[in-house]
Amino acid sequence: MRLEFSIYRYNPDVDDAPRMQDYTLEADEGRDMMLLDALIQLKEKDPSLSFRRSCREGVCGSDGLNMNGKNGLACITPISALNQPGKKIVIRPLPGLPVIRDLVVDMGQFYAQYEKIKPYLLNNGQNPPAREHLQMPEQREKLDGLYECILCACCSTSCPSFWWNPDKFIGPAGLLAAYRFLIDSRDTETDSRLDGLSDAFSVFRCHSIMNCVSVCPKGLNPTRAIGHIKSMLLQRNA
């Protein structure tokens, strides 16, 4: 089976502007490999092709890409989901972030927004307790669907609000984590966390477009979490 690709290429050291480059790959009939497998084979032919990868199991979040116009992880996206008769598989870097080279983007702004929400437990500056903080099962269950994020940035880079205000809007990934700590029974800084999210941009630039839900490789729902944060802010200010 002959696979055809159109891949975004840009090397700032030698290129004046980005371009799309065509590749072909012969694949075994009946064998459905993942896109990352195909990219690795293409890189064997063209060592200049750059992309990120690590675990190859959908755990590390390193290989987020835009594939046929939709964000996702290359390592868990089968070629059969992308290949259409008579059409090329179009691969681009995650949108909305500066391109370092080819399919590698600068994640600095994404991580900066994530850092703003203080993604760790706070306890009023007290010394760590002598033993772990205990939780009831129902308290722990509230965190399901919130802690599993792998920071691949597929959600935030699919969000128009993040494209338009990347330095002000926290983004879906950061706000999902923010809600995870807001409702954690072991955290004592709910008010200060809400203070940090109370401006006009951090949370309320989310317009519930739900691109983030559509592309999340872990099946999480950042839009729902953001809605809960909005409710907490509005109730506090009522």
Curated annotation (Swiss-Prot):
It is found in: Cell inner membrane. PROSITE patterns: 2FE2S_FER_2 (PS51085), 4FE4S_FER_1 (PS00198), 4FE4S_FER_2 (PS51379). Pathway: Carbohydrate metabolism; tricarboxylic acid cycle; fumarate from succinate (bacterial route): step 1/1. Its cofactor is [2Fe-2S] cluster; [3Fe-4S] cluster; [4Fe-4S] cluster. Its main location: membrane. A ubiquinone binds at W164. [2Fe-2S] cluster binds at C55, C60, C75. It is a peripheral membrane protein. Coiled coil: none annotated. Keywords: 2Fe-2S, 3Fe-4S, 4Fe-4S, Cell inner membrane, Cell membrane, Electron transport, Iron, Iron-sulfur, Membrane, Metal-binding, Oxidoreductase, Transport, Tricarboxylic acid cycle. GO terms for cellular component: membrane; plasma membrane. It comes from the Bacteria. Residues 139-169 form the 4Fe-4S ferredoxin-type domain. [4Fe-4S] cluster binds at C149, C152, C155, C216. GO terms for biological process: aerobic electron transport chain; aerobic respiration; respiratory electron transport chain; tricarboxylic acid cycle. Belongs to the succinate dehydrogenase/fumarate reductase iron-sulfur protein family. Part of an enzyme complex containing four subunits: a flavoprotein, an iron-sulfur, cytochrome b-556, and a hydrophobic anchor protein. The complex forms trimers. This is Succinate dehydrogenase iron-sulfur subunit. It comes from Escherichia coli (strain K12).
